[in-house]
Curated annotation (Swiss-Prot):
One of its GO terms (molecular function) is 1,4-dihydroxy-2-naphthoyl-CoA thioesterase activity. Belongs to the 4-hydroxybenzoyl-CoA thioesterase family. DHNA-CoA hydrolase subfamily. Pfam families: 4HBT_2. It catalyses: 1,4-dihydroxy-2-naphthoyl-CoA + H2O = 1,4-dihydroxy-2-naphthoate + CoA + H(+). Keywords: Hydrolase. Catalyzes the hydrolysis of 1,4-dihydroxy-2-naphthoyl-CoA (DHNA-CoA) to 1,4-dihydroxy-2-naphthoate (DHNA), a reaction involved in phylloquinone (vitamin K1) biosynthesis. GO terms for biological process: phylloquinone biosynthetic process. It is an enzyme of class 3 (hydrolase). It comes from Prochlorococcus marinus (strain NATL1A). This is 1,4-dihydroxy-2-naphthoyl-CoA hydrolase. HAMAP family: DHNA_CoA_hydrolase. InterPro entries: DHNA_CoA_hydrolase, HotDog_dom_sf. Its EC number is 3.1.2.28. The keyword DNA repair does not apply.
Amino acid sequence: MEKRNPREWLCLNRTVRFGETDAAGVVHFVELFRWCHETWEESLEKFGIVLKEIFPSTQINTSQLDVALPVVHCEANYFQPLYVGDTINIELYPEKINESSFVLLFKFKKNGEQIGTTNIKHVSINPITREKCALSKQINLWLHESGLNF
């Protein structure tokens, strides 16, 4: 199997849109968390994971999923404001905590300068019993491969 560079699925770029700003013309704080989730989803897709096998949808009954991955903690730090048209780089650094949880660390950069960070902790649970369970094979592989030579 060909060795892939994790940067292919862990570093993404985006441009700030008008609808993501508040009345002061600055990105609204909640957008960072939305961008984090979108970055994570895109990362999983680029890695080769089919999203509907990980996240519930109207096409799949939640009881058909092996695990659910709820957020149990999140926090953000903002160092500079962002405005419409700003281009930013989002770097994702996943870290496995134990057999049932992981944290997604995000660094937001503009022109090479770090302008914000977030971390979001997920726990793997059985979607029916809501009890902690082991992470799926797909997520474990993504976490393992994401930690190699970044």
